Amino acid sequence: MERWSYISLLFVALLFGSTQQLRSAEGAFRLRLNCKAAIECGAISKGDTIAIKGFTWGELSTAPLSYGIVKGRSIILTLQNAKCGEYVVELRKRAGGSKGASAEDGSNGASAEDGSNGASAAGGRVRNVMEFFVSDAESHREEKYAISYKNDAFYAQALEGAAENGLLAELNASIRDFSAGTIGNKQAKEALDSIYSKALASDSSALFTSLCRLSLDNRCRSVRYIRSVLPLEDPRVLYTNFVKSSVESYLKSLERNSTEALTFIAEDLVQSAHSTLKPYIALQIFNLFKEAEIMGQEAVAVEIAKRYLLNDESGSIEEMLGYEAYFGIMAFVQMNEHSLIGMKAPQIELPDSLGCLHSIPECGEGADDASPSLQLFYFYTSNCSSCRATTPLLAELLQRYEGIPIRIYAIFTGSNRSEWMSECAKFSLIKNPLVERIDLWDPEVESNFPLLYGVISTPQMLLTTDKGIIVGRRLTPKSLEQLLEAINEN
């Protein structure tokens, strides 16, 4: 097993627990940390802040859910109505020896064993002390740990509490020893196999074992296998870190599939998830594909957003995302849904320098025999550094172009006519008989081209067939050249 495969199990193990439905645990969940060993070696000092933070779909909370100032050898941290999920305990070293500042409003209280109130320290280095999992097993409402420090890492030994967290502490210790080089590959594998066997023997570790199987079994790496062990039907994974990265890895492993196949797979992923997870998975898919490296895959983001993020009459998704993020998704869809690959390019009318209107793209029906087989839309302006770099590269490419006829619509997006005329002169290099150039503009934006063609920035390039079908978008001179070569080879 690769070194980083072991380390990845750290995140896997954080999903310990039963497979019951997610709910807030009744009463308080207490975490008792005996820090004697860590204090004696100076890793933890009086005045340092100990804080519990939780995850929501891979994002660590910024404010502590519970906190305390180190004053004695033991610290008790309390989570009120804790959600079932993954938590981390962070240590923030006091800055400049200060005793700390007042607590943040709304935080749950925590105390040192002498009963003094906790406070958050200002500044200082933050270190991850340990991880634990809150299950909804009512028999385990308190976890006890001994915290030590060696090899520049904190170690947590579980003294009392849920069996899952005992295995988690054991796993973390093995991973940290392996990372520090104190144990080798063979010892690490033996330790992890032992922990996995213990997890299999536990009645309440189905979620953990399904994820452990994914990381431990090197013989099964098929896409179908990866998909089968993603526990998306379990609502508790909303409050974890590992599953989000697993979903992303799964989707990235499929990125060479067609856009249609990816859209189907993405929809299946969302549909298979628990209702509380659906918007989070949909948002993750949207963010992954909205700036897709492979041309055309932004269509996946558009489709998922329309079906699962914007089609919400209750307003709960807008509340979850916040107005700005929700509006950003809406704007992305509106600026891209009309000009995706495979679609017929929207028809617009733009004037040339003489005021003659040109209806573009030319769609072939009723056109004369000289109509171009390819049509290139190039949106650019004068006060754009990227345009100043792209225009000469594009002109040089079209000058040496050899292939089926192509027409370029050089569409100036500014409103200054003299600047437009200066920009037109930059295309004078093109004297290729296979290339026809038409200079157009729309200073009043009467054609609504920014919305119809997704021109939120310049330069933008889009290629269509003689029928006006979009075959390339978001092109650069290099990707345009590659696309033209592929088209001409066929």
Regions found by a protein language model. Name each.
Residues 388-429, 445-449:
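Structural microenvironment flanking redox-active thiols in thiol-disulfide oxidoreductases
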Residues 297-353, 362-372, 399, 418, ...:
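N-proximal helix/coil linker or "cap" segments that precede and/or mark the start of modular domains
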Residues 25-100, 105, 114, 118-229:
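A non-transmembrane, solvent-exposed segment enriched in polar/low-complexity residues
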Residues 1-33:
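Bacterial Sec-dependent N-terminal signal peptides
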Residues 188-191, 254-262, 297-298:
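Helix-turn-helix repeat elements of alpha-solenoid scaffolds
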